[in-house]
């Protein structure tokens, strides 16, 4: 931009002999030539101003130069004459004040084109169109590639475990029972060697999905023809997977009434990580599923109850020896976390929330897990947050409250006098199907209600004793509840009095 007025108004000129002359006085009202910028009161394309005359050249939308001239008021003229370049717009302005119609001698030129300016106008639009088209085609090709790759991956068994690893760690003909018995006789007592676990995990063939929960999925699989259950955890539930694996591999943990652990492994397939927990397979499913479809007699009722509490008793008991077992509390006992074997006995499963007691240091080992137990089965001290988290016996007594509710579920399905109730969850008539903490707190803590007993129980000695037993398990005061060992002994006496061999 050229601002001519400043030099001609303020700086004097010198004659050739060196004498200086005064600057030419500036007209108070300046007349300027106007073109494309003439006010309404202009005459013969002449406008008047107390500021500057200007001439400007700029490109229109088609790229053609357009010349504009006219008057600029005194206020703000300096700013306008010092034209600030605008990106992607070519223009130039020159101003003057030395005489009337001085702007007719101004001939501003467009600034030179920069590299990027050559793509403006029609050529720019054409280039833009080509670029957008090419990018769109590339995007479509990338999406198609990803889609077909995804479909090809989906076509494979989702949880397939490769056979690429060496099988020499496990001799041909060895069964799972053989391997487990060998590991127990070796004296470790903590399950199969990790290398054997990984080999088994890689040789599992997934057959069908048999369950799904908040932690992940359960599949029925096969290893050398033997059926196994494979729990596949979501990656968000890694803490549960780690804790359950850790508990199952605790020394002296194996018990006939605790779900038999086989192997655990982490497998990465590139797009996702799979967390496996492989256990014994029990086709009857959970106690919850079993009770919904099966009615019981006194013997089968006592068998389910006795085997369940035997597993719980083993969990709760600390074993002192050179390779001792710590006391363990389950913290999420419910009928869905107990499985029914072919022989009608139960085993306890899902130890992802279990807590251990380290007696040497008097320390309660709580898992770093955001997951919480099932609200319907929570005891009053958990619901009202009065449970002493640093006292291990608090967790043991919380388990016993939950076990009392499980006894109620079992007893309702026992036939007496030709009568039996349909299966229901505890508190089914008092809270919604998915109760909130507030729902359970009101019923269990404030109103101190418990599941009701059918009238027929009072006329059946076995069911009457079961009712008494569960009442002592779910007492409001944790210190008043029976221990698992006490319940186990009571059920054994009941079976003996009924002449039932467990």
UniProtKB/Swiss-Prot annotation:
The membrane topology noted for this protein in its Swiss-Prot or TrEMBL record is: Single-pass type I membrane protein
What is the recorded name of this protein? Bone morphogenetic protein receptor type-1B
Gene it is expressed from: Bmpr1b
Q: What is its main location?
A: membrane
Identify the species of origin: Mus musculus
Q: Which PANTHER family match?
A: BONE MORPHOGENETIC PROTEIN RECEPTOR TYPE-1B, TRANSFORMING GROWTH FACTOR-BETA RECEPTOR TYPE I AND II
Domain of life here? Answer: Eukaryota
Q: Which cofactor does it need?
A: Mg(2+); Mn(2+)
* A matching Pfam family: Activin_recp
Query: What is the protein's known function?
Result: On ligand binding, forms a receptor complex consisting of two type II and two type I transmembrane serine/threonine kinases. Type II receptors phosphorylate and activate type I receptors which autophosphorylate, then bind and activate SMAD transcriptional regulators. Receptor for BMP7/OP-1. Receptor for GDF5. Positively regulates chondrocyte differentiation through GDF5 interaction.
The kind of enzyme this is, by top-level EC class, is transferase
